[in-house]
Amino acid sequence: QGKAVAELMYACGVAVDMEYSPDGSGAYSGIVADALIQYFGYNKNMGYVSRNYFNTQEWMDMVKKELNEKRPILYNGASKEVGHEFVLDGYDKNNLVHVNWGWGGMNNGYFEIASLEPTSPGIGGGSSMGGGYIFDQGMIIGMQPESESTSYTSYFSLSELKASKSSFNQNESYDLTAVQLSNMTSTF
C-alpha cells in the first residue's frame, strides 16, 4: 500500500508541476483542477469560487451543498506569511468545518471557516500564523468523477443597472441594462 501511495503522490506532483523546497511544496489551484480533469478523470464542471464575493451565510451554504453532495472541497487560504491548500470534508451542527490540513493528521479537526487557524502549522505552514488562513480564501467546487449528469453553477455579481427612462408609468415598458456584471466563478 505504501508503494501505491508513493506512486499516486508522485503522479499528483508531476500533474500539477509541483514546486518543492525544504520548507514545503506548492502548486496553483487552477493547475490542480486542470490536472484532476485531464489526468485523473474528474468532471470538467469543476469551478473555482473566491470568498471575497459572498457573505458568511452564502459561503457556508455553498460549502454545505458541496459536502452534502459527498464532494470534498479543495480549499485555499493565506495567513500574513504563507498560503496553504487543504481539504474540507465535513461540517458539524455548529457550522464548524472539518479540515484535513495535509500534515499527516496533525491539527485535523473542526474550525470556524472565518479563522481556519491550526494550533501548530505543519511543514510549509509558517512560523507564526498571524491569525490563520483568513486571507484570499477560495475553493474548488464540483470535484467528482466524470459523469453525464452534472451541471455547473456560475455565480454573478451585479453592481450597476441603467434604465432607459428616469420615470415610469404603470404597465409601461422600459429597458434595463446591466452595466457592470461580473462572473465570480471560473471553470477549468
Task: List each model region and its residues.
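Surface-exposed charge patches in extracellular/virion surface proteins
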Residues: 3, 65, 162-165
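Catalytic Cys-His active-site segments of thiol-dependent hydrolases/isopeptidases
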Residues: 94-113
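Short, compositionally biased P/S/T/A/G/V-rich stretches that sit at domain boundaries
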Residues: 130, 136-186
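Cysteine-nucleophile protease catalytic domains, especially the papain-like/related folds used
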Residues: 1-49
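A recognition module on extended beta-rich or small alphabeta surfaces enriched in W/G with H and D/E
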Residues: 107-146
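Active-site-adjacent substructure of cysteine-protease-like catalytic cores
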Residues: 34, 38-100
